[in-house]
């Protein structure tokens, strides 16, 4: 569906060149939700603008839905963009138009008849859950409702690809989850390919099938979301994964505990799939002469299965504690002894 081959984008100015995107090669499959994550300045937004031709690459090729976006211009590019829609962080609605008229706007531009516009708008309003808000203006809507209008408008011309540029960054956590749920539902119902730009690993974990991590214009890591969570390779990726698995509260708890404890071992357990649901701690207590203290834990769902982490403290004779670590590993659970945070 989307292929990028050795794509680079350099912005030139009198103050010097900025290498926004550097030699990126990516393949995004039809019907998947693909996440691109990175901090500010990583090159995410520049990359997404290359996908719909808002920017042209300095080198390399960009192909979307069978068209080489990097090589077409004018009427052909405008036609290609009808198959590549986009939603934004700040909604970009027309404030003088109602919900109905905002959604109808791209259909008007495309020359669709009024009767067909009204029919399509009614379908989209139902799809995004805005029944009863047809005649409301953007100023009368919540942030989540505004983004739903943006999504409906983006879907008006039946695109093959939906680009989401920090689409949930301006929303509160509960509203973020509702919008992510809507995008996931649309992906399943319509088979729509979604490319999602974010700086929040929670967003990636929640709905993406695969993810690419960007730093300084480069893709430093790429893979299935569950695999990236289990075994992140790059330091940048590890920091993002820790947003979900080791939030600030967890680090504070561990730091305090390690400072106060002089015996035993503090162990981080990492569970994947069915192992996340096994009664491992009960088995340890029954099998070994040790004391087990559960410090903190969390199980999260990804599109490919469950992933969990649990921090425990095991105290007892050294040989018994060592046997516990070996036992944990024999149950297809990773065990890492924590000495500092």
Swiss-Prot record:
Subunit structure, as described in the record: The complex is composed of two ATP-binding proteins (MetN), two transmembrane proteins (MetI) and a solute-binding protein (MetQ).
Name listed for the protein in its UniProt record: Methionine import ATP-binding protein MetN 2
What the entry lists under SMART domains is as follows:
AAA, NIL
The record describes the protein's role as: Part of the ABC transporter complex MetNIQ involved in methionine import. Responsible for energy coupling to the transport system.
An example of a Gene Ontology cellular component annotation for this protein is: plasma membrane
Quickly give the catalysed reaction: L-methionine(out) + ATP + H2O = L-methionine(in) + ADP + phosphate + H(+); D-methionine(out) + ATP + H2O = D-methionine(in) + ADP + phosphate + H(+)
Q: How does it sit in the membrane?
A: Peripheral membrane protein
Binding positions (ATP): 38-45
Where, per UniProt, does this protein localize? Cell membrane
Please provide the record's keywords in A-Z order. Amino-acid transport, ATP-binding, Cell membrane, Membrane, Nucleotide-binding, Translocase, Transport
Q: Which domain of life is it from?
A: Bacteria
**Originating species:** Bacillus licheniformis (strain ATCC 14580 / DSM 13 / JCM 2505 / CCUG 7422 / NBRC 12200 / NCIMB 9375 / NCTC 10341 / NRRL NRS-1264 / Gibson 46)
- Residue ranges occupied by any ABC transporter domain in the UniProt entry: 2-241
Q: What EC number(s) are associated with this protein in UniProt?
A: 7.4.2.11
Under Gene Ontology molecular function, one entry of this record is: ATP binding
Q: Report the family membership.
A: Belongs to the ABC transporter superfamily. Methionine importer (TC 3.A.1.24) family.
Q: Which Pfam families match?
A: ABC_tran (PF00005), NIL (PF09383)
Top enzyme class, one word, equals translocase
């Amino acid at each position: 569906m989307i292929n990028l081959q050795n794509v680079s984008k350099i912005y030139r100015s009198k103050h010097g060149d900025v290498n926004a995107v550097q030699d990126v090669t990516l393949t995004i499959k039809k019907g998947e939700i693909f996440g691109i994550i990175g901090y500010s300045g990583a090159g995410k937004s520049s990359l997404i603008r290359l996908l719909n031709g808002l920017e042209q690459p300095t080198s390399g090729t960009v192909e979307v839905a069978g068209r080489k976006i990097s090589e077409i211009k004018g009427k052909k590019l405008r036609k290609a963009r009808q198959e590549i829609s986009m939603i934004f962080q700040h909604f970009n609605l027309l404030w003088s138009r109602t919900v109905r008229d905002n959604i109808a706007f791209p259909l008007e531009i495309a020359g669709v008849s009024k009767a067909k516009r009204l029919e399509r708008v009614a379908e989209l309003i139902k799809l995004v859950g805005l029944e009863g808000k047809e005649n409301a203006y953007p100023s009368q809507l919540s942030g989540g409702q505004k983004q739903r209008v943006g999504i409906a408008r983006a879907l008006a011309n039946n695109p093959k690809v939906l680009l989401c540029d920090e689409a949930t960054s301006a929303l509160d956590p509960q509203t973020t989850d509702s919008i992510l749920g809507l995008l996931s539902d649309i992906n399943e119902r319509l088979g729509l390919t979604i490319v999602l730009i974010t700086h929040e690993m929670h967003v990636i974990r929640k709905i993406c099938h695969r993810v690419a991590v960007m730093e300084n214009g480069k893709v430093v890591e790429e893979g299935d979301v569950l695999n990236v969570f289990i075994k992140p390779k790059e330091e940048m990726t590890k920091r993002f994964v820790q947003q979900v698995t080791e939030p600030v509260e967890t680090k504070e708890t561990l730091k305090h505990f390690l400072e106060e404890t002089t015996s035993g071992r503090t162990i981080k357990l990492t569970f994947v799939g069915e192992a996340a649901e096994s009664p491992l701690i009960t088995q340890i207590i029954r099998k070994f002469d040790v004391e087990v203290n559960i410090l903190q834990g969390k199980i999260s769902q990804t599109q490919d299965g469950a992933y969990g982490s649990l921090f425990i403290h095991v105290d007892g004779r050294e040989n018994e504690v060592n046997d516990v670590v070996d036992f944990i590993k024999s149950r297809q659970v990773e065990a890492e002894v924590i000495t500092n945070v």
